[in-house]
Amino acid sequence: MSKSEKPKISIVNPVWQTIRSEAETVISSQREMTSVIYSSILIHENLESVLSYRLAQKLNTTDMSEAVLNEIILDAYKTEKRLVEDAYLDIVAVKERDPACHRFLQPLLYYKGFLALQAYRVGNFLNGNGRYDFSYFLQMRSSEVFGVDIHPNATIGKGIMIDHAHSIVIGETAVVGNNVSMLHSVTLGGTGKDKGDRHPKIGDGVLLGAGASVLGNIRIGRCSKVASGSVVLSNVPKFKTVAGVPAKVVGDSGCDQPASVMDQNIQ
């Protein structure tokens, strides 16, 4: 190496390093998990390889093989690095907010909400590049396999947690900001068959409780909280809590970051 050349430095995401370390710990203590851990994590060089494998493994059909799916998804990750960055942020969000998540590898191996979100992210990227039917295929399979139906045209930010993830519906023109948390059975839907911009806009840091429905082209202000089982039909100011059917403001959100604190009590 000449004096003018700088040594190459390999930068490895610390979360990825931790995931690999956690995986090795699992094998050392639970040898019956060896095959699962090796094929799902340790055999892979990076997170994008893991995600491509896991999504292809879950979403393949007799007409769309695992190998073909893996190749297409991995190519999307290699083309758009933002997809990998967003996946890391989603993993961290789950680890920080879900008290049942003790390790970074858990979302990758066991959490269908996380996997469904990554399937959406890949589909959204491909949809934006004209591969509409493949993005619809991913949407269909994600709905069938994970019970999560996110239209590939929806816009979803970074650091998202979808907890439990049964019966999640996010419509075509919905917008979800950064650092949002939602529990199972959340619907971000329209109010009929109107076309155009017809779905909710969810601000940064919002917490959507279990069974909450937000309907129509309305705005939920940043760092607000929608109580479980509520039906929201009108705009919600920032830093407020709404509850009821139809939902009404019942107080402040109680903290600066409801989605991070995950306190579902009504203040």
Residues covered by each model-derived region:
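Terminal amphipathic alpha-helical/low-complexity segments used for targeting or macromolecular assembly
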Residues: 1-141, 259-267
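Structural signal for interior beta-strand "rungs" in well-ordered beta-sheet cores
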Residues: 143-250, 255
